[in-house]
Structures are given as structure tokens and as C-alpha cells.
């Protein structure tokens, strides 16, 4: 290499980007979803839901496969298969004529219904989906429990308890605000009554003051008149006394 010529090796930033795109980016794979547990009563029916996510468009070659492993068993057997737009139901096994296809691949739905449940149906059901070219991914499992009478789920009980507590809290809050409203209303009425009483007292005091103001000159006039009458009477009496002396 000639002195001063630029290096032909890739820059560290470009190498890091290439490494992250090839190594660090996760590979996309199909993801299948089912319930974890489902409960049913003897003689009833249950729906085993199965859906999926795929990075590819729904292919015409999409397939769904359901397998069943009995409770306490080791091996799983195929009980249902969907491919090329057609459902294939087991015709010789324990679920003969009891499985119904209710899925719709266009909506990424591979659900089935099991009719006329029995205690022997207890076990694990596995849903497997292939959507070529997206065929790599994990299956999903749902466990079926069959009872004579379906028990109340813990979540339902918990929800009922929480709902009851919230109802009581709301009732207490409503009662608190109602009592507070009545108390404030009563205080306002009492305040209005006190204000009216104060105004009445003020008006009465003003009237009394004005009445006393009007009565004062009259009293003074009456007093002056009384004094004048008394003086005149005394003067008259004195004059009569002097006239009597003169006659003697």
C-alpha cells in the first residue's frame, strides 16, 4: 500500500451495525396462543381457542393441528387437522364425532369445539400452526378439567369481592357527601336566621333612638311649661298676699 493512501478496511461503526443486524436482531417466528386452563361440565361442550401471530400473510397452505395427551398419559395423539382449506376430524379415537371446527384462518383462528364432555376427556390439548414460509415456532397448550358441575373460578370470586368492596366504598362516600350537604344547608339556614335577627335588632334600635330623639324636645317643653305655670302661680299668690296686707 502506498504511503498516504486511504485504508480500505471498513469503519468500526459500519462493522458494529453489520454485527447487530446479523447477530443481535431476533429471528421472527410464528407465535401460537391458547388458554392455560379451561373447565367444563359432564355432558356439556367447551371451545378450545387457538390463535397465532405471524410475520407473513396468511398462506393458502396454512395448517392447524390439535393433539391430545390424556391426564397421566405420556404420549399425545392427533385428534384434528386442518389443511388446504379442509378440516380432518378423527373418526376412530375417543373424540369421534365430537369435534367441531369453528376456526377461520383469515382471522388467524384455529379453534375447535368438543361436545358431550366426559371425565375421560381430562388432559392437555396442544395447538400447532404452520403458515408457510413461517413454520418455525412453539406450540401452545391448554389443560381441560371436566367436573360434574363447573366450579366458580377464583378470578370470578375475586372480581365479585372487589366489586362488593368498591360498592361499599361508593355507598359510604355518597352517604358522607349527603350528610355534609345537609349539614352545610342547615348551617346556611341558621346563618340566614341569625343575620335576619341582627338586622331586626338594628332596625328596632334605630327606631327607639329616633323615638327618643323626638320625645326629648317634648319633655323639655313640658318641663318649661310646668316651670312657667309654677312661677305664675307663685307670683299670683304673692300678689294676693300683698293686697291683703294693704287692706289691713
UniProtKB/Swiss-Prot annotation:
Superkingdom of origin: Eukaryota
Role this protein plays: Is an adhesion molecule necessary for normal myelination in the peripheral nervous system. It mediates adhesion between adjacent myelin wraps and ultimately drives myelin compaction.
Cellular component GO terms held in the UniProt record: plasma membrane
Signal sequence, start to end: 1-29
Disulfide bonds: 50-127
Membrane spanning residue stretches: 154-179
UniProt xrefs under InterPro entries: Ig-like_dom (IPR007110), Ig-like_dom_sf (IPR036179), Ig-like_fold (IPR013783), Ig_sub (IPR003599), Ig_V-set (IPR013106), Myelin_P0-rel (IPR000920), Myelin_P0_CS (IPR019738), Myelin_P0_Ig-like (IPR047014)
UniProt protein name: Myelin protein P0
GO BP terms, alphabetized: cell aggregation; cell-cell adhesion via plasma-membrane adhesion molecules; cell-cell junction maintenance; myelination
Gene source species: Mus musculus
Tissues where the protein occurs: Found only in peripheral nervous system Schwann cells.
Main localisation: membrane
Chain's gene name: Mpz
Protein's UniProt keywords contain Hydrolase: no
Coiled-coil region(s): none
Ranges of Basic and acidic residues composition bias in the record: 224-248
Disordered: annotated segments: 222-248
Extracellular topological segments: 30-153
Statement: the UniProt record of this protein carries the keyword Phosphoprotein: yes
Pfam (any one): Myelin-PO_C
This protein's UniProt keywords: Cell membrane, Disulfide bond, Glycoprotein, Immunoglobulin domain, Membrane, Phosphoprotein, Signal, Transmembrane, Transmembrane helix
Glycosylation sites: 122
Membrane topology per record: Single-pass type I membrane protein
Subcellular location: Cell membrane
Domain Ig-like V-type as annotated: residue spans: 30-143
Sequence similarity: Belongs to the myelin P0 protein family.
Subunit structure: Homodimer and homotetramer.
Residue intervals on the Cytoplasmic side: 180-248
Amino acid at each position: 500500500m502506498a504511503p498516504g493512501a486511504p485504508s480500505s478496511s471498513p469503519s468500526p461503526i459500519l462493522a458494529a451495525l453489520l454485527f447487530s443486524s446479523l447477530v443481535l436482531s431476533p429471528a421472527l417466528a410464528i407465535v401460537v396462543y391458547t388458554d392455560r386452563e379451561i373447565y367444563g361440565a359432564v355432558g356439556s361442550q367447551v371451545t378450545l381457542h387457538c390463535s397465532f401471530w405471524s410475520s407473513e400473510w396468511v398462506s393458502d397452505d396454512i395448517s392447524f393441528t390439535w393433539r391430545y395427551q390424556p391426564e397421566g398419559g405420556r404420549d399425545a395423539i392427533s385428534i384434528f387437522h386442518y389443511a388446504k382449506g379442509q378440516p380432518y376430524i378423527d373418526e376412530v379415537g375417543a373424540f369421534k364425532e365430537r369435534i367441531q371446527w369453528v376456526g377461520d384462518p383469515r382471522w388467524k383462528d384455529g379453534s375447535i369445539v368438543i361436545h358431550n364432555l366426559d371425565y375421560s376427556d381430562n388432559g392437555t390439548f396442544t395447538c400447532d400452526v404452520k403458515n408457510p414460509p413461517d413454520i418455525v415456532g412453539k406450540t401452545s397448550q391448554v389443560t381441560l378439567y371436566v367436573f360434574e358441575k363447573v366450579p366458580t373460578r377464583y378470578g370470578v370470586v375475586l372480581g365479585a369481592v372487589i366489586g362488593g368492596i368498591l360498592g361499599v366504598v361508593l355507598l359510604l362516600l355518597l352517604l358522607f357527601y349527603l350528610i355534609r350537604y345537609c349539614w352545610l344547608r342547615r348551617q346556611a339556614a341558621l346563618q340566614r336566621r341569625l343575620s335576619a335577627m341582627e338586622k331586626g335588632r338594628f332596625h328596632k334600635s334605630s327606631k327607639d333612638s329616633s323615638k327618643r330623639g323626638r320625645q326629648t324636645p317634648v319633655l323639655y317643653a313640658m318641663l318649661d311649661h310646668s316651670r312657667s305655670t309654677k312661677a305664675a302661680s307663685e307670683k299670683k299668690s304673692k300678689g294676693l298676699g300683698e293686697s291683703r296686707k294693704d287692706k289691713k
